[in-house]
């Protein structure tokens, strides 16, 4: 099997925090960040790439300028949605997320372990060059798997930063993490 290129893109800055709105769109800064993806030299040759997004507004809105420029249809894939926090109240989500971040992967709640496994299984089964617009924790799940880290959170991807993956024979053979920065959603 030939090499498959996969690019993960973190969404732009959201108009509200995770604890304030379960599905915010992009802020004005987030819209500008998404527009700048069209000028990113490393994202120029995406004509043969499949465009995939989390179902969340901020991920879809982040993809919109680049997908429009390249006349791409966006596929929504629930696997790349944010970390599941079923039963966690909005006002408690940040504290919950901090506890998840410091927990060994093997001790994560079953729903989070299943979410993590689906992400990895899906990444390893992609058979076409793809760009995926997604979330902080999804990107961390992929890095933790590829680098065999014991905890889920190991990087702080900036808004609209990328992780470039090369996969072959259902294995990640290279991974390059883009810009990192502490953002208001990061822990």
Task: Give, region by region, the residue ranges found by the protein language model.
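Histidine-centered active-site/metal-ligand motif
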Residues: 11, 135, 181-184
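Phosphate-handling substructures
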Residues: 24-25, 67-120, 176, 187
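Domain-level recognition of soluble alpha/beta enzyme cores
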Residues: 149-177
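Active-site signature of alpha/beta-hydrolase-fold catalytic machinery across serine-
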Residues: 65, 141, 145
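Short active-site segment of divalent metal-dependent hydrolases/proteases
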Residues: 14, 138-139
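Short, well-ordered beta-to-alpha junction loops that form the rim of enzyme active sites
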Residues: 54-56, 79, 133-137
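Generic beta-sheet signal
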Residues: 6, 49, 126-137
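Active-site-proximal alpha-helix that buttresses catalytic centers in soluble enzyme cores
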Residues: 2-76, 99, 103, 160
């Amino acid at each position: 099997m030939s090499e498959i290129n996969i690019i993960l893109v973190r969404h732009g800055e959201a108009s509200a925090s995770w604890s304030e709105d379960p599905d915010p769109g992009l802020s004005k800064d987030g819209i500008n960040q998404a527009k700048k993806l069209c000028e990113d030299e490393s994202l120029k040759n995406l004509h043969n790439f499949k465009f995939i997004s989390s179902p969340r507004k901020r991920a879809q809105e982040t993809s919109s300028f680049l997908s429009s420029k390249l006349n791409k249809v966006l596929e929504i894939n629930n696997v790349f949605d944010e970390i599941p926090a079923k039963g966690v109240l909005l006002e408690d989500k940040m504290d919950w997320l901090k506890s998840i971040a410091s927990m060994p992967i093997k001790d994560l709640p079953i729903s989070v372990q299943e979410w993590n496994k689906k992400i990895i299984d899906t990444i390893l089964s992609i058979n076409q060059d793809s760009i995926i617009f997604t979330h902080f924790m999804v990107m961390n799940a992929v890095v933790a798997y590829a680098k065999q880290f014991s905890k889920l959170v190991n990087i702080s991807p900036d808004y609209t930063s990328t992780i470039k993956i090369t996969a072959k024979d259902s294995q990640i053979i290279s991974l390059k993490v883009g810009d990192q920065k502490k953002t208001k959603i990061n822990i």
